């Protein structure tokens, strides 16, 4: 793709998201979603092959269905309230339809099936945009309509998303699919807290984006797409590979890494709201995520996959691509736990 075209497409994606975030009128929000969706299709099809075409088609159909459902909910709400304003959701059916549409855009269970398939079919760069930037717009709308959301519906979706995110990643060898299932689980944690403490959801989303960005950038740095290629990279770039493994453990929520903060605070907040069973179940199912990350770490760092004799550990540094953003991203993705007492302002 030529640089001027890429710049225009990326600017359109950013503009679409900004329109969604800054609007309080449902029609403008819908336009922002459509701009965002149509602009990311060429990014997903950047590497032109049947897998990328299939992934783009699946993404387009899912997002178009979600947009249609959202507009239907907005129309029903308009008939009852007579207003396009986002804060006036007076009809419960309209609220359920809007919530369903936004969760479909985010990839929450039971609308999660497109996320692993689309992520696996595109390049690492496209997958990174899909699992980070594309989550911001729907989450910002959920944040704004959180007082009107049906809590029971969202809690059910959250619990099943955490379960699906852990269960689906267990037998995966493709790193992009592992990241996709991790994304589903993280979206579940955010959905669980959004009706009780929306500000905490923003903290969770920020940390999730930081950790996912860092992990994908390291994947791109050493061109790893499978667990086997990651284990071979252990011989070639031990430092980069060990950073990937630490980031994955952080994504799994292992203390004392940054990924533990949102899980800890969400469980604490739900318990304060007299909910015991749901946070307990979520904590238990989150162990599935942690298990497949630990298994990946063990198989990569502590066991040696079959390889040829010329793939022994290289101790000298090779020339690698410069990545100025990576060090601060890695530090914030792994070492923020000591700052947790400062987050008491969220209560």
Curated annotation (Swiss-Prot):
<keyword id="KW-1133">Transmembrane helix</keyword>
<dbReference type="GO" id="GO:0006120">
    <property type="term" value="P:mitochondrial electron transport, NADH to ubiquinone"/>
</dbReference>
<feature type="transmembrane region" description="Helical">
    <location>
        <begin position="3"/>
        <end position="23"/>
    </location>
</feature>
<dbReference type="Pfam" id="PF06444">
    <property type="entry name" value="NADH_dehy_S2_C"/>
</dbReference>
<keyword id="KW-1278">Translocase</keyword>
<feature type="transmembrane region" description="Helical">
    <location>
        <begin position="274"/>
        <end position="294"/>
    </location>
</feature>
<feature type="transmembrane region" description="Helical">
    <location>
        <begin position="93"/>
        <end position="115"/>
    </location>
</feature>
<keyword id="KW-0830">Ubiquinone</keyword>
<feature type="transmembrane region" description="Helical">
    <location>
        <begin position="237"/>
        <end position="257"/>
    </location>
</feature>
<feature type="transmembrane region" description="Helical">
    <location>
        <begin position="201"/>
        <end position="221"/>
    </location>
</feature>
<feature type="transmembrane region" description="Helical">
    <location>
        <begin position="325"/>
        <end position="345"/>
    </location>
</feature>
<dbReference type="GO" id="GO:0005743">
    <property type="term" value="C:mitochondrial inner membrane"/>
</dbReference>
<feature type="transmembrane region" description="Helical">
    <location>
        <begin position="25"/>
        <end position="45"/>
    </location>
</feature>
<feature type="transmembrane region" description="Helical">
    <location>
        <begin position="66"/>
        <end position="86"/>
    </location>
</feature>
<keyword id="KW-0679">Respiratory chain</keyword>
<keyword id="KW-0496">Mitochondrion</keyword>
<comment type="function">
    <text>Core subunit of the mitochondrial membrane respiratory chain NADH dehydrogenase (Complex I) which catalyzes electron transfer from NADH through the respiratory chain, using ubiquinone as an electron acceptor. Essential for the catalytic activity and assembly of complex I.</text>
</comment>
<comment type="subunit">
    <text>Core subunit of respiratory chain NADH dehydrogenase (Complex I) which is composed of 45 different subunits. Interacts with TMEM242.</text>
</comment>
<keyword id="KW-0812">Transmembrane</keyword>
<dbReference type="InterPro" id="IPR010933">
    <property type="entry name" value="NADH_DH_su2_C"/>
</dbReference>
<keyword id="KW-0472">Membrane</keyword>
<keyword id="KW-0249">Electron transport</keyword>
<feature type="transmembrane region" description="Helical">
    <location>
        <begin position="178"/>
        <end position="198"/>
    </location>
</feature>
<feature type="transmembrane region" description="Helical">
    <location>
        <begin position="149"/>
        <end position="169"/>
    </location>
</feature>
<dbReference type="InterPro" id="IPR050175">
    <property type="entry name" value="Complex_I_Subunit_2"/>
</dbReference>
<dbReference type="GO" id="GO:0032981">
    <property type="term" value="P:mitochondrial respiratory chain complex I assembly"/>
</dbReference>
<dbReference type="InterPro" id="IPR003917">
    <property type="entry name" value="NADH_UbQ_OxRdtase_chain2"/>
</dbReference>
<keyword id="KW-0813">Transport</keyword>
<dbReference type="InterPro" id="IPR001750">
    <property type="entry name" value="ND/Mrp_TM"/>
</dbReference>
<dbReference type="GO" id="GO:0008137">
    <property type="term" value="F:NADH dehydrogenase (ubiquinone) activity"/>
</dbReference>
<comment type="similarity">
    <text>Belongs to the complex I subunit 2 family.</text>
</comment>
<keyword id="KW-0999">Mitochondrion inner membrane</keyword>
<dbReference type="Pfam" id="PF00361">
    <property type="entry name" value="Proton_antipo_M"/>
</dbReference>
<keyword id="KW-0520">NAD</keyword>
<protein>
    <recommendedName>
        <fullName>NADH-ubiquinone oxidoreductase chain 2</fullName>
        <ecNumber>7.1.1.2</ecNumber>
    </recommendedName>
</protein>
């Amino acid at each position: 793709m030529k640089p001027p075209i890429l710049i225009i497409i990326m600017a359109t994606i950013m503009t679409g998201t900004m329109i969604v975030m800054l609007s309080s009128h449902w029609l403008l929000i819908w336009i922002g979603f459509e701009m965002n969706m149509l602009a990311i299709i060429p990014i997903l099809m950047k590497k032109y092959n049947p897998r990328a075409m299939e992934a783009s088609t699946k993404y387009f159909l899912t997002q178009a269905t979600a947009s249609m459902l959202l507009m239907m909910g907005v129309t029903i709400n308009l008939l009852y309230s007579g207003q396009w304003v986002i804060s006036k959701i007076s009809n419960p059916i309209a609220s359920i339809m809007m919530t369903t549409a936004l969760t479909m855009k985010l990839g929450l269970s039971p609308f999660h099936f497109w996320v692993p398939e689309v992520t696996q079919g595109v390049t690492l760069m496209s997958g990174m945009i899909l699992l980070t930037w594309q989550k911001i717009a729907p989450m910002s709308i959920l944040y704004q309509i959180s007082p009107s959301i049906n809590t029971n519906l969202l809690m059910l979706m959250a619990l099943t998303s955490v379960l699906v995110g852990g269960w689906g990643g267990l037998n995966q060898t493709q790193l992009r699919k592992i990241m996709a299932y991790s994304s589903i689980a993280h979206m579940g944690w955010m959905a669980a807290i959004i009706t009780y403490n929306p500000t905490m959801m923003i903290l969770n989303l920020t940390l999730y984006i930081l950790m996912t960005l860092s992990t994908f950038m390291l994947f791109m740095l050493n061109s790893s797409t499978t667990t086997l290629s990651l284990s071979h990279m252990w011989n070639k770039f031990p430092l980069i590979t060990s950073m990937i493994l630490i980031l994955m453990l952080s994504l799994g929520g292992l203390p004392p890494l940054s990924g533990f903060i949102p899980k800890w605070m969400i469980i604490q907040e739900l318990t304060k709201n007299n909910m015991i069973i749901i946070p307990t179940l979520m904590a238990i199912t989150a162990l599935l995520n942690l298990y497949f990350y630990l298994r990946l770490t063990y198989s990569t760092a502590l066991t040696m996959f079959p390889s040829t004799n010329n793939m022994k550990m290289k101790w000298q540094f090779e020339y690698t691509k410069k990545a100025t953003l990576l060090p601060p991203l890695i530090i914030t993705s792994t070492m923020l736990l000591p700052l947790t007492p400062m987050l008491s302002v969220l209560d």
